[in-house]
């Protein structure tokens, strides 16, 4: 019995050890595959530099989200041997690398044939530091990330190579991100302006787009809306920028317009930003834009549809805004105050608190409109009681302002001390239906124009090189005649 028990225990031990070894082997194989993948990306970058084709570099950068998940200290140490020759450059790179995990398995040494003997080209050097910066940000190692970002900017700033523009544009974004995490955005503003001037002079369109977005985010972080508006007016955003950069720019533009009380323009820009953003990714960005759209729609006097709050991935994050919408729709000042006090910190994090405070006037207008529809005559004291105002004089002032603004059609009778509502008129006898149709038609026309611009047509000179059907028939006829003549000449030769 004892022997059988010992044998069973040994079997259990034998089952545990292979599992641990298998996990270690899988981890090692993943690291080897990651190193090989990044080396292939480096070859693509070198190919793009040699052929002066940016599409190879663009293909590598598009794969950055997948690459960043595979990075670790072991991968970086193996790559450094094949990129940098032994010396100061390799030591500087190794000093910034993240620490190797305790359970990590070291990869075999790089073969002598693959060990670097000369310094890498500027594009490969910048790409390695970009990967290093991304990993340090993910690891929340802000001290090393700051040093790595400064080193990367120094490498990019001293170069004047068009093949470095795409990597530089991506680097500016993460450089600004590190400064934001370290709460030092103000310190990099002059550097970003200098790089924007350089990118504009060199026609670096992707760099221009990223730098303008970084500067707008910088200004909005400190609520400098006037400076952000001046930057938008004095700079030209490149049409060839990627969809992601356009989505960011339109979102920042919507925030600026909303802060400056231009709600119609703000709503238009925010809707465009939502359409240009990825439909099945970037959930955080879509949530942020949708929150601002809801607040702007409420400021415009519109009530968002209930289906907006039921979208997958947005339902939980929009819960506070659903309650806010309910309070505005009902014109309930008490409920509006409760929502603002309960979710105030959340609204401040979403950068919508200032706009939501402005909604108080909309809530009052909605309440007065509902009172005007419900009562033909009502005293200011009753209005103050319903709106929970301090005095009847406040209610009288608010009602007179609502009448002046056209919110309600009513008259105030100070002698008898009541508000008399006028009979409701037929809305189809006014210009409102015409204006609504005009807005819809304008939207359809703008959508059509944007769709046409998005299509790619061959240049006009392309058709000049193409022959018509008659020219083709004439050419074929000439070829046949020439072939007959050659055949006759051959026969004559015999």
Curated annotation (Swiss-Prot):
Blood (crystal) cells and cuticle. The keyword 4Fe-4S does not apply. InterPro entries: 26S_Psome_reg_C, CSN3, PCI_dom, WH_DNA-bd_sf. Keywords: Proteasome. Residues 462-486 have a biased composition (Basic and acidic residues). GO terms for cellular component: cytosol; nucleoplasm; proteasome complex; proteasome regulatory particle; proteasome regulatory particle, lid subcomplex. Belongs to the proteasome subunit S3 family. Acts as a regulatory subunit of the 26 proteasome which is involved in the ATP-dependent degradation of ubiquitinated proteins. This is Probable 26S proteasome non-ATPase regulatory subunit 3. The lineage of its organism: Eukaryota, Metazoa, Ecdysozoa, Arthropoda, Hexapoda.
């Amino acid at each position: 019995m004892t022997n059988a028990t010992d044998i069973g225990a040994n079997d259990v031990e034998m089952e545990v050890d292979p599992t641990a070894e298998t996990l270690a082997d899988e981890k090692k194989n993943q690291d080897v595959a990651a190193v090989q993948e990044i080396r292939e990306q480096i070859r693509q970058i070198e190919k793009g530099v040699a052929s002066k084709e940016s599409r190879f570099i663009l293909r590598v950068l598009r794969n950055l989200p997948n690459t960043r998940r595979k990075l670790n200290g072991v991968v970086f140490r193996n790559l450094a041997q094949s990129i940098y020759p032994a010396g100061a450059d390799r030591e500087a790179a190794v000093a910034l690398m993240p620490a190797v995990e305790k359970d990590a398995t070291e990869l075999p040494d790089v073969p002598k044939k693959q060990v670097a003997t000369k310094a890498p080209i500027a594009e490969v050097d910048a790409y390695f530091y970009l990967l290093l910066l991304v990993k340090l940000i993910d690891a929340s190692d802000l001290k090393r990330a700051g040093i790595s970002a400064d080193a990367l900017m120094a490498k990019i700033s001293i170069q004047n190579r068009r093949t470095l523009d795409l990597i530089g544009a991506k680097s500016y974004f993460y450089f600004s991100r590190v400064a934001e995490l370290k709460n030092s955005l103000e310190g990099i503003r002059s550097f970003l302006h200098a790089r924007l001037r350089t990118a504009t002079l060199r026609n670096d369109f992707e760099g221009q787009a990223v730098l303008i977005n970084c500067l707008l985010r910088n200004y909005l972080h400190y609520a400098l809306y006037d400076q952000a508006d001046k930057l938008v007016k004095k700079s030209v955003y490149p049409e060839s920028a990627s969809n992601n950069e356009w989505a960011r720019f339109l979102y920042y533009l919507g925030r600026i317009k909303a802060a400056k009380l231009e709600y119609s323009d703000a709503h238009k820009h925010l809707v465009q930003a939502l359409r240009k953003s990825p439909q099945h990714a970037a959930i955080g960005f879509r949530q942020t834009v949708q929150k601002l759209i809801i607040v702007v729609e409420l400021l415009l006097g519109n009530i968002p549809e209930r289906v907006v709050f039921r979208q997958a991935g947005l339902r939980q994050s929009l819960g506070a805004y659903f309650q806010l919408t309910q309070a505005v729709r009902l014109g309930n000042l008490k409920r509006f105050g409760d929502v603002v006090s309960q979710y105030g910190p959340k609204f401040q994090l979403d950068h919508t608190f200032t706009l939501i405070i402005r909604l108080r006037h909309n809530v009052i207008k909605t309440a007065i409109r509902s009172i005007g529809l419900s009562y033909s005559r009502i005293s200011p004291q009753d209005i103050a009681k319903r709106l929970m105002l301090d005095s009847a004089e406040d209610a009288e002032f608010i009602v007179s302002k609502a009448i002046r603004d056209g919110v309600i059609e009513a008259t105030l009778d100070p002698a008898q001390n009541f508000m008399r509502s006028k009979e409701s008129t037929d809305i189809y006898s006014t210009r409102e239906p015409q204006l609504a149709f005009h807005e819809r038609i304008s939207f359809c026309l703008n959508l059509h124009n944007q769709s046409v611009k998005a299509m790619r047509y061959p240049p006009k000179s392309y058709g000049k090189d193409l022959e018509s059907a008659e020219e083709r028939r004439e050419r074929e006829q000439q070829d046949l005649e020439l072939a007959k003549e050659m055949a006759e000449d051959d026969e004559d030769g015999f």
